[in-house]
Amino acid sequence: MATCRRRRRGCNSQARRSRHESDPFVRRARAEGWRSRAALKLEAIDQRDGLFRPGQVVVDLGAAPGGWSQLVAPKVGSAGRVVAIDLLEMDPLPGVTFLHADFSTDEGLRAVERALEGRPVDIVLSDMAPNLTGHNAVDQPAAMGLAELAADFAGQFLHKNGDFLVKVFHGEGFDAFRGDLTRRFSRVLSRKPDASRSGSREVYLLARGPTV
């Protein structure tokens, strides 16, 4: 019989699944009906920083499976608007306009503009992460590339009092990215909610009030 030593990759995968299933935030998210544990991270940031109000317009980049949009839609209410966009399919959510598109393309941007119907954007959200290979030399640049795409989108669509919340990872490129946000926004805050795994390099940057 093959042992874990002989099949390290498979055993590592099993260990990750086991940690995921035993995670109290995963269990809580399921019990509360959220599509992903990421909703609990956003809820914690909202409770601390007061992001969402009725009537706001929010764009959720890389939205699938929809945990963030699911949380935000009732907060902004019927007077608000949530536009979710992803290359992956996403099951419909009440109060959410889903675009199956790539926001980094001209076609995707035009789709967002049509969905907004001329309304200014109050908040841009990005919980995107690349498909991880396990090799930091590959994964970190890919993650920072997604964050930079999201920042460019926010710079194009946010109004002057808007907020940009983006997931990034400590490592190469992080300091430069944060420095760029500091030049482009009035304030940049770091947030690591309890629902983020303690050993993860994941952190959320909340950039408030575009200045350029």
Curated annotation (Swiss-Prot):
It catalyses: uridine(2552) in 23S rRNA + S-adenosyl-L-methionine = 2'-O-methyluridine(2552) in 23S rRNA + S-adenosyl-L-homocysteine + H(+). The active site is at residue 167. Its EC number is 2.1.1.166. Keywords: Cytoplasm, Methyltransferase, rRNA processing, S-adenosyl-L-methionine, Transferase. One of its GO terms (molecular function) is rRNA (uridine-2'-O-)-methyltransferase activity. Belongs to the class I-like SAM-binding methyltransferase superfamily. RNA methyltransferase RlmE family. Its main location: cytoplasm. One of its GO terms (cellular component) is cytoplasm. It is found in: Cytoplasm. This is Ribosomal RNA large subunit methyltransferase E. S-adenosyl-L-methionine binds at residues 66, 68, 86, 102, 127. Specifically methylates the uridine in position 2552 of 23S rRNA at the 2'-O position of the ribose in the fully assembled 50S ribosomal subunit. Residues 1-10 have a biased composition (Basic residues). Residues 1-24 are annotated as: Disordered. Gene3D superfamilies: Vaccinia Virus protein VP39. It comes from the Bacteria. InterPro entries: RNA_methyltr_RlmE, RNA_MeTrfase_FtsJ_dom, rRNA-MeTfrase_E, SAM-dependent_MTases_sf. PANTHER family: RIBOSOMAL RNA METHYLTRANSFERASE, RRNA METHYLTRANSFERASE 2, MITOCHONDRIAL. Disulfide bonds: none annotated. It is an enzyme of class 2 (transferase).
